[in-house]
Amino acid sequence: IQNEFVIENPIKRLIKINQLPWTEKQKEFFRIALHPDTNIVFVTGPAGTAKTLLSTYCGLQLMNMKLISDIMYLRSAVESSDQSLGFLPGTADDKLKFFNMPFVDKLEELLGSEKRAEKLSEEKRVSMFPVNFARGMNWSGKCIILDEAQNSTIKEITTVLTRMGKGSKCFILADPMQTDIRHEAKHGGFVKMSKVFSDEESLEHGVYNFEFTHEDIMRSELVKFLIGKLNKSGL
């Protein structure tokens, strides 16, 4: 049964989205991600495979299709370093700005300018906040992007998934090689959660797993070489 949930968004203007030279693997991802029966996609891949870019692109397309009202970008506030920076001065927005930069960068790349990205934020068509703010919320008609999910616990991922209401679509993105949390298993909660939802029953409920490999790295040939070398080394 196809999802017929349609957003009555008072903002009628279409978003002009830059079209990039997508690979066949990326087009395959779009076919799954944008399918009306798809609800959740666990996306695995090393650095440089454009996981955030592709999910953001899908969110923008879904807004143009009037299937969602807005994009919500979430991350766990975990630093990508073995040493914490400790207390940082400033407002909550100031402190979270650096965690949100990957999403803002992808928005600007797809929209063509910082001004156009800011306009979407002003119209409340995009929002960004940490995972621990999600509890108690109910998300209907939204595209949820949980980025760097290898740094999320099972409880955090469960919290995000169980916020989903009618008409929402969720992308859970992770690179298990880049786990920065110390208090859970080596790969955080993502690997366990994605395995739980990798069966036929999950597919019947619109829950998919999609994997990019080092062969799909687009950032640079150097990064592709580095990731391939690290994979072979077993480090």
Describe each model-derived feature in a short phrase:
Residues I1-N3:
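Pre-ATPase regulatory/linker segments immediately N-terminal to the P-loop/RecA-like helicase/translocase core
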